[in-house]
Amino acid sequence: MQFSRVEPRSQLALSFLFICCSIKPALAHDHFNPLSLENDEPGVENVDLSVFEKGGQAEGTYNVDIYINNTSVETKNIAFKNKKSADNKLSLQPCLSVEQLKQWGVKTENFPELKNDPNGCTDLSLLAGAVAKFNVIGNRLDLAIPQIALIADPREFVPTSEWDEGINAFLLNYSFTGSQDHDIDENRTENSEYANLRPGINIGAWRFRNYSTWNHDSDGQNSWDSAYTYVSRDIEFLKGQLIAGENNTPADVFDSISFKGVQISSDDDMLPDSMKGFAPVIRGVAKSSAQVTVEQNGYTIYKTNVPAGPFAINDLYPTGGSGDLYVTIKESDGSEQHFIVPYASVPVLQREGHLKYDLTVGRTRSSDTHSAQQNFAELTALYGLAGGITAYGGIESTLSNDVYHAALIGTGLNLGDLGALSLDVTNSWSKIKAGDVVSDTLTGQSWRIRYSKDIQSTGTNFTVAGYRYSTKDYYALEDVLDTYSDNSHYDHVRNRTDLSLSQDIIYGSISLTLYNEDYWNDTHTTSLGIGYNNTRHNVSYGINYSYTLNADNSQDEDDDTEDSNDQQISINISIPLDAFMPSTYATYNMNSAKDGDTTHTVGLNGTALAQKNLSWSVQEGYSSQEKATSGNVSATYNGTYADINGGYSYDNHMRRLNYGVQGGVLLHRNGLTLSQPMDDTIILVKAPGAAGVPVNNETGVDTDFRGYAVVPYASPYHRNEVSLDTTGIRKNIELIDTSKTLVPTRGAVVRAEYKTNIGYKALMVLTRINNLPVPFGATVSSLTKPDNHSSFVGDAGQAWLTGLEKQGRLLVKWGPTAADRCQVSYRIPSSPSASGVEILHEQCQ
């Protein structure tokens, strides 16, 4: 229950009260006599207003945003007590435990005098210079703590003490799609259905996951398959994950392969964003207390204050690409130092001192039932050295025999103005199988080079990655396994080149992609793409060209494989129609292929409903080759309980009706909650009784009829803020707090619990048995719902109460003795007020 100002007369009385309480003392202590309230209310007795008289506020628990040195750290409930400061001023001070201070980065071990009192509170004044200021109106608690008492954590650092393993739960993601195809030429109708299920179980820090699929069609196919099954958990001290079951190896060093076994690998999501990816360490020396500013490509990307002496900045956000860093040190006397730190990056580069690792032991696996399997082990590591250098390498080997061994060593370099480069070499020792004959050990080498460069002055960015297998006897592990399979046809790659280039121009940008791969059997594949795209006045348009060639240059007369190539050019335009139809776009696409067929497609697409959770599309097309039209219409609804989609399409030969539903099921201690499709890490919203409340920034996610909802994705090991939108909620619902911050571990189901006040709202006029109003400032609390917040009595005995039951009893107190209290029995009328607020007159006895 909460106090609310309801009448002008009440507002005047309260204003007068607080003005009187805020007047500074002159020669004597000012005292506000509560009997002065008797002007309007004869018989009002002496009410204890000493706290307000001294400039204090009501003690209790407040939901506050906590800031340390102007940096937001958490939102939570904190208990406050009125305490006197050194200058004898009364103010609300927080009850903070030693554990909370440690969680927020205070070096509590350096201050042994910090201890919790019997109420679990410590004396913040024991930290020299520490000050707590509470803004009651803004619900903000500011803690000013000397820098020397704080751990120097990188930006957005989250201590492991905040990590939440979540609740025990059963999860199920499901997807079902179906279609009915009618072949006009053969007058035949076929039906097909597909489903996938992704069940999971969370128990403590352990996660069990499975992925299974089902296929059914009119030809009688009815099959279940399991794509993977594994259990996992995080290992905090290794900053990594343990996985046992079916998974894939990372592709940082060797090519990724599927396996069944055990894997321990680093998890970079455990790092704050400012420590992920690659960025150089900036070192310098400040002559005095100074401000350091870092700029890249004309933008300020970092600013901090440093004391006099040497400093190192190691928590720059990775910006991608390249572009030198311009550093300015502004001294306290206004003088400045300037220097440049070269910066560029390729995928393998790691921050100085950071180790990325993977250890896998298991058995290879493949969806191809004919593929051979081998026990194997793989170990890879990448380590960031000083000077923008990264050393990396790995070993990969079969265990039960000498079928395959490989070792790789390489280095990555930040070359500054010259870009970024990585170079590695792999040695392999292989025994391949030809027919029934296993070869002797074949030794081969492969060199790989990757390069990236961003030329800011011309707006050019390009990345080239070239693989060259220098000897014919080099094999990757999967190449060797292919020779042992029942279907022994495989392509033995000789070299591969990838090129990606983009160039900004006055209006838009031009892009170029090139992929070329050739094999030792003299076949090769080439793919080329060129495009121009631009957006002007919200109108997007572009033109793209693609070319693909599969060529066979071998001299094998028995091989009747023909060269094949394909060329396509397309034009696309998208125009917003907000002036006529909000959230709607008109589109046009033209596609012309080498065979002479040109298709033109026009359409409308957009979103609808208040939360934009209904997307729709209508298209009509024409083919010049067949001189026939085609079309389709589709819609997708993102609902609280599931996503539903459907569509219909047609052309000269086929009519197709398709439909689908995707969603999630979460079984937890408080029951069962349906949701949209869930990611691996999710948040359960618990607001008991608050039905139909939207979750901010989550399309279509509202609380269900019990007050529960699932936020279908969350960032593991990072702070996730979940807030509820209270605009338009039902009149009998009150949310005591609306925002929570949570830090889930990977795969966790964390619960965001909101305290609710469900019930009737009333403006209650309280009188005593002598028919005089209950004293101003008295507190009102529920005897039948003790969890409800207390309220205060205003002028003329008026109290604003929320969360009331149909009938109940209230306790009213205005002093410390038994004579200073009474009880009220009330009943809400059988026909509630249309406004949602009841006006009640009750006697307190």
Please place each PLM-identified region on the residue numbering.
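A short, amphipathic beta-strand motif
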Residues: 66, 282-284, 683-687, 760-769
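Feature captures outer-membrane beta-barrel proteins of Gram-negative bacteria and organelles
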Residues: 163, 191-204, 224-238, 373-387, ...
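Transmembrane beta-strands of outer-membrane beta-barrel pores
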Residues: 149, 178-182, 205, 214-218, ...
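Short, acidic Ser/Thr/Gly-rich low-complexity loop/linker segments typical of extracellular
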Residues: 700-708, 785-798
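Short Pro-Gly-centered beta-turn/loop motif in secreted/extracellular proteins
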Residues: 87-96, 316-322, 708-734, 746, ...
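Short, ordered, surface-exposed loop/turn motifs in non-cytosolic proteins
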Residues: 58-81, 689-699, 770-785
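Post-signal-peptide, soluble extracytosolic/periplasmic N-terminal scaffold domains
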Residues: 2-8, 13-17, 25-276, 593-666
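Extracellular beta-sheet/turn segments enriched in Thr/Pro/Gly and aliphatic residues
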Residues: 140-145, 347-351, 738-759, 826-845
